[in-house]
């Protein structure tokens, strides 16, 4: 529902999920994807990867914010909650937090659910979001912003600010609607 890269998801810190003011002073829950000097294992693919991704309502309905609040309430020895990742149990290996998740997804999850094909892997979820938005007529520059794709315009990528979260939410995120897009009845077989 976000179109984020697997490593972007796996390397999220608790404080990367936050409310950000939109156009009308309303706050919107977002993933703040950024490279942070004090977190050297957190790397972005390119300059366009640095972005704010509004959180889809389905993820909110599934209790993501309650999960964040729970993580914030836990006492961590010698560390504040801000220094913890959302998925702290994922080890860093081969330059990524996503390596083991990718292996598990491709070698265990997909075969167990009879979804294994040569063309399906975790990255297929990004392609699904991209294609879904394209088929809904969303302009490519909005899709690129949501997905963190480079546009080829280095000036915009390096010096330009990203769209306001409300714009990306309205142009993209709220248009990500699958037939069973609800917190209790998601059918992943079509992915």
Spell out what each predicted region is.
Residues 2, 76, 93-145, 149-152:
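Short, basic (Lys/Arg/His-rich) helix/loop patches that form interaction surfaces
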Residues 11-62:
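Conserved tyrosine-mediated DNA breakage-rejoining catalytic core shared by Y-recombinases
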Residues 7-12, 143:
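Alpha-helix N-cap/helix-start motif at helix boundaries, enriched for small hydrophobics
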Residues 15-19, 24-32, 72-73, 103-107, ...:
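Active/binding-pocket-proximal capping segment
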Residues 37, 49, 54-117:
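Active-site/catalytic core of tyrosine-dependent DNA strand-transfer enzymes
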